[in-house]
């Protein structure tokens, strides 16, 4: 049987090789070996995702590669999630995050990973899905009173809709009741600052860390 370091290395490899089946296999192997799921995700899957992200930034890989890597990571996380849910039921929620992919954008993989990581970190996550109308984000803030509302955009053409969330939350009189987070491949800190978003999630790990910091949890 492989030791912990080998299993974690294999988890990273599954992501950098865009291998869904290997990611699932490694996740099952890790659970059987009693490896902490959070450690597997952070040192294995996320480390692999960060490597893919760096290569994408350097022009060595392209968006389909990033999506394939994210798909593999999602496959692994799905295996681990039931175990994480079991643990989470024994601890107090850190807060509620409503998250969705912005209107006009059918890509959900990045949003799915961030949602999974927030869930694992101890937040109650309300997944609004993909191609979510702006008014749905606003209505969910009024209805659920989450601490954070997050929108993901994978295209520059849909990214502009994130401005509408900020504006419509203000019009509805609830902007000061919630933190807003934006993320996605074309999204930057400059963009978040420009539109007035509270949090920019560069990666899933970054999003979790910044949500925790923003809420002081």
Swiss-Prot record:
Q: Which GO terms describe its cellular component?
A: cytosol
- Domain B12-binding spans what residues? 94-217
On whether Repeat is a keyword of this UniProt record, the answer is yes
- Could you name the domain of life of the organism this protein comes from? Archaea
Q: Which PROSITE patterns match?
A: B12_BINDING, B12_BINDING_NTER
The family note in this entry says:
Belongs to the methylamine corrinoid protein family.
Q: What does this protein do?
A: Acts probably as a methyl group carrier between MttB and either MtbA or MtaA.
Q: Quaternary state and partners of this protein?
A: Can form a complex with MttB.
Name used for this protein in its record: Trimethylamine corrinoid protein
Q: What gene name is listed for this protein?
A: mttC
């Amino acid at each position: 049987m492989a030791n912990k370091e080998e299993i974690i290395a294999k988890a990273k490899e599954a992501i950098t090789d865009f291998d869904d089946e290997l990611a699932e296999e490694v996740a099952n192997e890790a659970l059987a070996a009693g490896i902490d799921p959070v450690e597997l995700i952070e040192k294995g899957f996320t480390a692999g995702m960060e490597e893919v992200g760096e290569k994408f930034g350097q022009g060595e890989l392209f968006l389909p590669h990033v999506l394939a890597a994210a798909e593999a990571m999602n496959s692994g996380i799905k295996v681990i999630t039931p175990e994480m849910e079991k643990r989470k039921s024994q601890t107090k929620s850190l807060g509620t995050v409503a998250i969705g992919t912005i209107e006009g954008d059918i890509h959900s993989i990045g949003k799915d990973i961030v949602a999974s990581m927030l869930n694992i970190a101890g937040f109650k996550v309300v997944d609004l899905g993909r191609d979510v109308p702006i008014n749905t984000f606003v209505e969910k803030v009024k209805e659920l009173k989450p601490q954070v509302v997050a929108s993901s955009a994978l295209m520059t053409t849909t990214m502009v809709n994130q401005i509408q969330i900020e504006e419509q939350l203000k019009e509805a009189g609830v902007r000061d009741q919630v933190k807003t987070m934006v993320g996605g491949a074309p999204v930057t800190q400059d963009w978040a600052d420009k539109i007035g978003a509270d949090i920019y999630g560069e990666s899933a790990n970054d999003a979790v860390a910044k949500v925790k910091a923003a809420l002081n949890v």
